[in-house]
């Protein structure tokens, strides 16, 4: 999903990591999940509930045991910069490793591990600016691995976005859906970056959640199926900051899940996925990525 982030003043562009950018709100700019994908999620919800009920009847499993499948993902990181300067988006190896560590720590409690399969750095001013429309050209040149492997692209400019990613789908090798798969992320959201309040590396965590098939916690608002995950409380709209106690759907159970990685809270507010989201990740993984070529 794409996060809207107002552009920093031009004078700050050359001092990207040295001077923090002022904090600004953001919102999703990517297309909503398709009706077909929403129906898939609702079917998963039915199947997951049946499996959980059966596990309790048998007395063999707890709620978390249902999601015990371990998932291991190869990751390819691509740094796409306008120049070899840090202000041009040219992340250092230390920054890359720190970002990778954040991903590992965020997903490890849910049975998901990552292996850094490769990194590369490309200097191309056109590719480094997502707003110029070179996404597919860039990805045709840089993408590696199979559909079950995660490609992360860190760009200098995102046209006002923090990042976006694509949901799992049926994708044959060489198809548009296959090539564009992965996450594109603003370089300054990496740990220690200049995107104030969004520089602990959790933009990547949020985007990878989409790659695994998770929707925003506020998907669908207060009515209907929402994000189709039973243990994420209904939420009318995205959070801003870290509004503890916010309850945007007072007629529904629970307060807003502001600490969930799939809300729009600031990085320091993020803490968790839910067991239901873990189950959903497993459902999408098994159906779309696990055996993909």
Curated annotation (Swiss-Prot):
One Gene Ontology cellular component annotation held by this UniProt entry: extracellular region
Keywords, ordered alphabetically: Disulfide bond, Glycoprotein, Hydrolase, Metal-binding, Metalloprotease, Protease, Secreted, Signal, Zinc
Domain of life, source organism: Eukaryota
UniProt-annotated binding residues for Zn(2+): 206, 210
Positions annotated with a glycan in the UniProt record: 60
GO terms of biological process kind: proteolysis
InterPro entries named in the record: MetalloPept_cat_dom_sf, Peptidase_M43
Leader sequence segment: 1-18
Active-site residues from the entry: 207
EC numbers, comma separated: 3.4.24.-
Protein name (Swiss-Prot/TrEMBL): Extracellular metalloprotease PODANS_2_14170
Organism: Podospora anserina (strain S / ATCC MYA-4624 / DSM 980 / FGSC 10383)
